[in-house]
Regions:
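Flexible coil/turn residues that form the inter-helical turn or adjacent wing/linker of helix-turn-helix
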Residues: 164, 226, 378, 428, ...
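Helicase motor core with emphasis on the C-terminal RecA-like subdomain
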Residues: 1-10, 14-18, 22-44, 51-54, ...
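Accessory DNA-binding and partner-docking regions appended to nucleic-acid-acting proteins
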Residues: 1-6, 337-338, 349-353, 363-365, ...
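Short, charged low-complexity linear segments at domain edges
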Residues: 359-389
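Short helix-to-turn junction characteristic of helix-turn-helix DNA-binding domains
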Residues: 27, 222, 273, 375, ...
Length: 610
């Protein structure tokens, strides 16, 4: 079969996405490849198609067990024989899989990097006809990458032992220039074909918010989107437990994922999410790499991540089916402090000497600063992301909160000076909420406990809305007029430049959003409209729900996630085309020959018998 025929038969697509065909052609021509393609751009097809066209085995080196299982299950659903070799297999299962591999049963084999150096796998590899090695999540080889894994450094050594050097393809979703250079060098790529596809994901809506009550923001959002799947990312395990526990207590079916859970619990919780038994996943960044759930409609970051690379990779897990999805970041000053603490804790990594650790720490601090700037910019959020990765987009995308908000330059000198004076008079001993509650004249338990009613600046900003005070405070932290430290809990401190703000004649202005409350209401209307994916017409909604129910029924029968039957995008296209026969069903995006033979008649019957 040609590459186009393979694409349609097994994957159900009529055309390749941007960048895919050029990568496939390079690999088929025997050239090494370094491909940087954002999450959702279809990296896996770039090595799966050549693997099916060429004689020999393709080894896919992958860092996570969950990633391998998900990919192999998807391939098997598409009628492609594939297997994985990792620590989740019993000894008997492992050697059976190796025996089948030697017999040529699997054109594609996923393997953990730790397995490359084991005696049993080396014996297999030395006698096998390996056409290609695809290194997934290739940024893991670089100590400058956000997920450095020392086991990836063994890949080049493994390749050097093979009797015949295979073609090598390195794939990653996010990589700066330094990381790309590291990947090419550490994997010993030979004159590679390098490509970086456009990072922009036009279907994703970006927003940064600074709510006083993050949990309420998340809770209310989920209630507005009861049928949508979403991920809530938290910085720490403790927060994951806290947020997930509250959601369950409030009647929301949520589950959780972090490294502190047992393997079995993580596996069960992950399955609950991908099988749609549970719509909300609360997790640390340990969750998501390689999880091919295409219908995630929102990703909410409960905290600001450490860097833009991690943020864009995690946010990119929304809307992989191409339909509208939302990426919302909830910022607070404490997030900066927590991330600084996590960066400093990197010193505990025994695999790095002190000099290397310092270099990594300094780089991480710079990345954190760039991430913080993202949270404060009033320019287009999409443009900020693209610029960070070396691309230049429009200065107005129309699909982020900043582009949908009108800003104006406002004088905030009076409020800013009051904040600095309040911190100074109170002895630099309190957190953000105590300072802001003092300025607005609140009478909370802590205000009374600390006798803040006696502070000279108590209630001087009583007429200023609390959201505006919070925006001004965050701006003062960004401009380093105030700082936050972690002395058990977050404390507001003065800086060496605090005094400048108090000098006679000093003035501070900042961009502030206009008519904020009105925009909030408009945003909620926009959300509801975008939640029903794609071009679905109102009269087709009953058919769409019927097809989703059939998909769930089939998924339960076959014990697979619903999105592996057909994606929402495919079901929507069925609602539009309303196929009556095989030829018409094969015109539906995402329906290939193999899946038609398995499911086609049942879906045609469902369409015709509404």
């Amino acid at each position: 079969m040609t590459k186009q025929e393979l694409l349609k038969t097994h994957f159900g697509y009529d055309t390749f996405r941007e960048g895919q065909e050029a990568v496939i052609d390079a690999l088929l021509a025997g050239k090494d490849v370094l491909a940087v393609m954002p999450t959702g751009a279809g990296k896996s097809i770039c090595y799966q198609v050549p693997a099916l066209m060429m004689k020999g085995i393709t080894l896919v080196i992958s860092p996570l067990i969950s990633l391998m299982k998900d990919q192999v299950r998807s391939l098997n659903q598409a009628g492609i024989s594939a297997a994985y070799l990792n620590s989740s297999l019993t000894q008997g299962q492992y050697f059976t899989a190796l025996r089948y591999a030697k017999a040529g049963r699997y054109p594609i084999i996923y393997v953990a990097p730790e397995r490359l150096t084991t005696e049993a796998f080396l014996d297999f590899a030395l006698s096998a006809d390996i056409f290609m090695i695809a290194v997934d999540e290739a940024h893991c080889v670089s100590q400058w990458g956000q997920d450095f894994r020392p086991s990836y450094l063994k890949i080049a050594e493994f390749v050097a032992q093979l009797p015949k050097r295979p073609v090598i393809g390195a794939f990653t979703a996010t990589a700066t220039k330094e990381v790309r250079e590291d990947i090419a060098r550490l994997l010993n790529l030979r004159d590679p074909f390098c490509t970086t596809t456009e990072f922009d994901r036009e279907n994703l809506y970006f927003a940064v918010k600074t709510p006083k009550d993050k949990y309420k923001e998340v809770h209310d959002y989920i209630l507005e989107h009861p049928d949508d799947s979403g991920i809530i990312y938290c910085l720490t395990r403790k927060l994951v437990e806290e947020v997930c526990g509250k959601l369950i207590q409030d009647g929301i079916t949520a589950t959780r994922y972090h490294a502190g859970l047992s393997d079995e619990e993580r596996r069960n919780n992950q399955d609950d999410f991908i099988y749609d038994r549970c719509h909300v996943m609360v997790a640390t960044n340990a969750f998501g790499m390689g999880i091919d759930k295409s219908d995630v409609r929102y990703v909410i970051h409960y905290n600001m991540p450490k860097n833009m690379e991690g943020y864009y990779q995690e946010a990119g897990r929304a809307g992989r089916d191409g339909d509208p999805a939302e990426c919302i970041l909830l910022y607070s000053g404490k997030d900066v402090v927590t991330n600084q603490y996590l960066i400093e804790r990197g010193q505990d990594n025994q695999e790095m000497d002190m000099e290397t650790w310092r270099l990594v720490r300094d780089r991480d601090q710079e990345r954190l600063k760039q991430m913080t700037f993202y949270c404060f910019t009033h320019d287009c959020l999409r443009e900020y992301i693209l610029k960070y990765f070396g691309e230049y987009g429009k200065s107005y995308c129309g699909n982020c909160l900043n582009c949908q908000t009108e800003f104006e330059e406002q004088d905030v000198t009076e409020e800013a000076q009051a904040m600095v004076q309040c911190v100074k008079e109170s002895g630099q001993r309190y957190g953000v909420n105590v300072i802001l509650d003092t300025l607005r004249g609140a009478s909370t338990a802590k205000i009374r406990q600390y006798h803040m009613e006696e502070n000279s600046f108590y209630s001087v900003c009583a007429k200023t809305p609390v959201y505006r005070l919070r925006q001004i405070f965050n701006y003062l932290v960004l401009e380093e007029y105030l700082s936050l430290t972690d002395d058990g809990y977050t404390i507001v401190k003065l800086t060496s430049t605090s005094r400048d703000l108090l000098e006679k004649g000093s003035m501070l202005t900042m961009k502030m959003p206009k008519a904020q409350e009105l925009q909030k209401k408009e945003k909620k209307v926009r959300r509801r409209k975008s939640s029903t994916a794609g071009e679905l017409k109102e009269q087709d909604e009953p058919l769409f729900q019927k097809l989703r129910a059939l998909r769930t029924e089939i998924a339960r029968e076959e014990k697979i996630p619903p999105y592996m039957v057909f994606s929402d995008k495919t079901l929507i296209h069925m609602c539009i085309l309303k196929p009556e026969n095989e030829a018409e069903m094969l015109d539906v995006t995402g329906v290939g020959r193999h899946k038609f033979e398995k499911y086609g008649k049942r879906f045609i019957d469902a369409v015709q018998n509404l």
